[in-house]
Amino acid sequence: MARTDGDTWDLASSVGATATSVAASRAFASRGPDALIDDPYARLLVEAVGLPHFVKVARGEIDFDGDPLFGAQQAINQIVVRTRIFDDFLTDAGQREPQIRQAVILASGLDTRAYRLDWPAGTVVYEIDQPEVIDFKTAVLTDAGVAPAADRRTVGIDLREDWPTALRDAGFDPDRPTAWIAEGLLPYLPPDAQDRLLDSITALSAPGSRLATEHMDAKALTGDWAKAMTERARRHGSDIDLTKLFYNGERRSATEHLGAVGWQTSVQTSNDAYIANGFGPIRDDLLAMIGDSGYLTAWRP
């Protein structure tokens, strides 16, 4: 089903299922003694959602090696790069900038960074997502006896609504610098909503604030990449259709938008990110599909 204004979801449907998919990938990459990332709670959460395909992914019960798009190791490499970039961004922000003691995770889904990262003392981590998603994750981890590693504060609201007011009501201080992450979020917003989100972040960001998100090549959202990933998902038993979940239409890149409103930006291409993490360069056919996509970091002077 195509996206509509005001549509809703849970962790087993629509956009919510993509959060479960990413958590399943983190669980898959966290298995074994030589795992390249460590998300000890991803499998627990995926199993609690209960979608059979993603439970099998999390447990390592699906054989991806014969897939014509990319196999198991390539899937691990991708989620390792993505997870490390956002993990390291939050960790480095707190270590390099002693004044940054608040972080905001937008569309937090099944993100467990508030529980598993080593946060500086006094850090407040705000998680924003739909109320049902927030409540589900909180309940599962609480029932398992898992406690946050920082002062975790949840903000249950759709990002298409007045989330800045809800964030401030939860204790957020816009006069203090903030570390923001928007992982796997922007393609699921209409172009105008993406611009409004970035403007809201800017309005809430004191000097010294930092932001990390993906830099998306617009043609990858509705072109061959989205179609190829949808076909791959179906080959392995998932019915997620990214071509229906991504929004069409001309889109100003987050890099361009943030630069125009005073942020200093830097983009690391996906290929460079792979090489920096010790993996070989991305195959030419995959690069042709993802275009100039990569990872964006920004600093507000």
From Swiss-Prot:
This is Putative S-adenosyl-L-methionine-dependent methyltransferase Mflv_5024. Keywords: Methyltransferase, S-adenosyl-L-methionine, Transferase. The keyword Methyltransferase applies. S-adenosyl-L-methionine binds at D129, D158, L159. GO terms for molecular function: methyltransferase activity. Belongs to the UPF0677 family. Exhibits S-adenosyl-L-methionine-dependent methyltransferase activity. InterPro entries: Ppm1/Ppm2/Tcmp, SAM-dependent_MTases_sf, SAM_mthyl_Trfase_ML2640-like. Pfam families: LCM. It comes from the Bacteria. One of its GO terms (biological process) is methylation. Its EC number is 2.1.1.-. The keyword Repeat does not apply.
